[in-house]
Regions:
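A short, structured beta-strand/loop element
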Residues: 15-18
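Short, charge-rich amphipathic interface segments used for partner binding and complex assembly
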Residues: 20-25, 29-63
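Short, charge/polar-rich alpha-helical segments
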Residues: 1-13
Length: 63
């Protein structure tokens, strides 16, 4: 399960990075919806990281 969680983290971070880089291409402030997407991704990343770490630790104890 830790492999799947780590893969999810990588996908989330990659998507967030893509959004940020796209926002940087435009002059002025990004749209509020784009900012919300980045913030929501940050919240999900912050929630998944400890679960992934816990699963990795658990797998290390079992295996």
């Amino acid at each position: 399960m830790s492999d799947k969680l780590n893969a999810l983290l990588e996908r989330l971070k990659a998507h967030q990075r893509t959004l940020i880089l796209a926002m940087a291409e435009h002059d002025g402030l990004p749209a509020g919806s784009a900012l919300r997407q980045v913030a929501e991704l940050e919240n999900v990343i912050a929630a998944v990281e400890p679960v992934a770490a816990e699963e990795t630790e658990r797998a290390g104890r079992v295996g």
